[in-house]
Amino acid sequence: MLAWVIIASIITAGFSVALVGMNATKAQGNAAASAFESVARQPEAGDQINRMLLFALAFIETIMIFTLTVALILLFANPLLGKLS
């Protein structure tokens, strides 16, 4: 039973980081492309668009950091292992 929990934790950590990483990268690319297009249409609003883009990128990156934190907890400090041993 303990081996299955370890295997499931490794697979879950790998898939979660990979999937969230791909989606976060795509979301950041879409946000940047939209910001560049908006600045090209309205150059006078460039400072406000830049500020909003940085907030959006920070929120997107926060999701990735939370996922990485959960994956590292599953790999190195798994709370399920203490209950099974």
Curated annotation (Swiss-Prot):
Q: How does it sit in the membrane?
A: Multi-pass membrane protein
Instruction: Give the family, as the similarity comment puts it.
Output: Belongs to the ATPase C chain family.
What is the protein named? ATP synthase subunit c
**Transmembrane portions of the chain:** 1-21, 53-73
Which proteins does it associate with, and in what oligomeric form? Answer: F-type ATPases have 2 components, F(1) - the catalytic core - and F(0) - the membrane proton channel. F(1) has five subunits: alpha(3), beta(3), gamma(1), delta(1), epsilon(1). F(0) has three main subunits: a(1), b(2) and c(10-14). The alpha and beta chains form an alternating ring which encloses part of the gamma chain. F(1) is attached to F(0) by a central stalk formed by the gamma and epsilon chains, while a peripheral stalk is formed by the delta and b chains.
Function (record text):
F(1)F(0) ATP synthase produces ATP from ADP in the presence of a proton or sodium gradient. F-type ATPases consist of two structural domains, F(1) containing the extramembraneous catalytic core and F(0) containing the membrane proton channel, linked together by a central stalk and a peripheral stalk. During catalysis, ATP synthesis in the catalytic domain of F(1) is coupled via a rotary mechanism of the central stalk subunits to proton translocation.
Name any one Pfam family assigned in the record: ATP-synt_C
* Keywords for the protein's UniProt record, in alphabetical order: ATP synthesis, Cell inner membrane, Cell membrane, CF(0), Hydrogen ion transport, Ion transport, Lipid-binding, Membrane, Transmembrane, Transmembrane helix, Transport
Where exactly is the site Reversibly protonated during proton transport?
A: E61
User: How is this protein annotated for GO cellular component?
Assistant: plasma membrane; proton-transporting ATP synthase complex; proton-transporting two-sector ATPase complex, proton-transporting domain
Subcellular localization(s) per the UniProt record:
Cell inner membrane
- Source domain of life is Bacteria
- Record GO terms (molecular function): lipid binding; proton-transporting ATP synthase activity, rotational mechanism
PROSITE patterns found in the cross-reference section: ATPASE_C
Any one biological process term the GO annotation gives: proton motive force-driven ATP synthesis
